[in-house]
Amino acid sequence: MSNPVTITEAAALHIKDMMKEHEEENAFLRVGVKGGGCSGLSYGMGFEHEKSESDSVFDQHGITVLVDKESLDIMNGTVIDYKQSMLGGGFTIDNPNAIASCGCGSSFRTATNAGKPEEC
């Protein structure tokens, strides 16, 4: 079975730099989805030191990634990348399950999950 989420090499390098900067080299990277935003769902990404029995756990480019059970179907097939431009850099999230997103780009919905929309 392939990993539900792909972390590109560029994203992994930036994540490793962030882990080192924040002295989190031994942490896991948790990615997930929560209700919120004007389209109903928003992404979350952060460092954690404990994993749950229900987490999907996999390694990408030397980073141990955790995805909670509730986020797994929504994020299946997602690619997390890091892009650099003249205006700066940032993570991009390409989720093939997202069918609509808000104008500001901070939230989305899928065909099977409308999430919990909030006012912008």
UniProtKB/Swiss-Prot annotation:
PANTHER family, from UniProt? Answer: IRON-SULFUR ASSEMBLY PROTEIN ISCA, CHLOROPLASTIC (PTHR47265:SF1)
Result of knocking out the encoding gene: Not essential for growth on minimal medium.
Residue ranges that the Swiss-Prot or TrEMBL entry lists as coiled coil: none
Q: Supply the source organism for this entry.
A: Bacillus subtilis (strain 168)
What is one GO cellular-component annotation here? Answer: cytoplasm
SUPFAM superfamilies per record: HesB-like domain
What's the protein name?
A: Uncharacterized protein SufA
GO biological process: one example: iron-sulfur cluster assembly
Q: Which family does it belong to?
A: Belongs to the HesB/IscA family.
